[in-house]
Amino acid sequence: MPVFAVAGSGTREQVQDLRLDVHMQLVDTPRAATILLVAGAIPEELAEALARLHDSIPHPRCTVWWPLGAPSGAWLGSFPHHVAIEDQVPGRLTAIQRELLSGQRPSEPPILPDVDAAPWRGVGPFGQGGTGMTGGTPYGRPMAELGPDRDGLRLDVLPLTVGPFFPRFPAGLVLDAKLAGDILVEVAVRDNPFVTNSVRGNDRAGRGPFLRALTEPVSLAELELARARAHLRWVADALAACELAALGLRVLRLATAIMPGDSEPVESLARVLGWTQALGWSTRGVGRIEAAALEGLGAGPVARASGLPDDLRAQDQAYRDLGFEPIVQAEGDAAARWRQRLAEATQSLELAGRAGDRRTIPTGSIESPRGLLEPAGGPAARLLPLIPGLLEGMEWGDAVTTLVSLDLDLEEASAAAGQAHGEAVAS
Amino acid sequence: MILLGPVGVALAVFVAAILLALLIRVSGDVQRHPALAVPERSPFAGGEAPVVHAWNRYHARYYVMALVFLAFDMEMVFMYPWAVVFVREGGIAMVEMGMFITILLLGVLYAWRERVFEWA
């Protein structure tokens, strides 16, 4: 059934795993959906955008909330109608869709008022004609302002806000862009909505090993397996963003099934992707970041793809005993970041196979799959300020490729803070 | 058919066409769906509302490429009569066509320098 899924705090992987079920069809636009699935807690800042998303789903529609450990009432403020489900998500969603289509379950009314922000009616008897078409405000909406083009012409600069639920971007990322044709001429990134008080202090039991490693010893084998899986999950998402969704699904299946020491499938995947010229053309030379710009940001694979041997694991005695050395690439473009993550996935599986019962010593910071994670913030928070400078002047397609290759997780920082907070409360 | 005669057939077709048009019109009215609410109509770009109209005057860059293509298309047209007389005229025709293509090629190089072939 067609589902538009919104991944709230800490639910990215569970939502991604829904793709593995043959009955689930995660669609990219609410127009194609019947069910709006909201997982976890959504910060209040995104409530209005979520309501707009809900209202743009055609009838019959239904909202389903999958709490996944989020406290009840974390999100329900503006949603008078919804169904909460705990488990057996695909089965329950199928049943709900059947009820909707057979008329047993009424379609949900809109949340936002049916009021046009820019009402307009022409002079003719059918509302046609008048100054609206040619007077600079077609159908009551102002047209984009003019800006200089590279040919010396003055053409429209279209303001466009993308996100927070744009399916190719991490949940919560909002870009205020200005487009001249296909080119981004101005980009601003809004504040991370997850770093607010409205989602902090959630019940974060059962979070991943990297968050636990901030405060307690965790086995190296578990950490490295989780790292390899996280990289493969990124590859799965990035392939879907390249419109190679079927291959992405296979990689996702691999990510959930791979075991320590079993690096051969990942190596062959890296070979196949290396041969794939369609991927090479869309990533080579795209989104190049100089090493100097990433110095001290703890940007993990992104920094290492630009040639910075920046890895907390290199300072850990347990990793040094295993002969760990950071892998680095030189180019620093999106293609290098693809290669970097695949190489690191292979390396992590090998490390996990040899790690035995070694454990980390909690130091308050950890090298997560996305970079240096500490309670004060994750790598996404440090990479966000780079984005406007990186994307300006790019074509829209390249901008999406670049953003996907950065693997931002806006929610990770608040999760790390929540983990530290939870520990402090517990002790 | 024979009973009706040619005028009768034309009349029958005329009446049938009018009835069909009315039928289509009435069935459209019967099936009419309620108008979409404003949030249902607004374009989706991730959950935020658009602020300006989507009518957007942007640079159709392919038109310069189209002009360059046209120039080479005409060159091919010149080549047909040239190919007919080429054997008779020999080397001199070869040199003339070489000059013609070189001049066109200089034009392409100029267009390249002016970033005509950049799509965006």
Predicted regions and their residues:
Chain A
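Iron-sulfur-associated redox domains of electron-transfer enzymes in respiratory
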Residues: M1-A118, A345
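Metal/cofactor-centered catalytic core regions of large enzymes
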Residues: E86-L93, Q97-S427
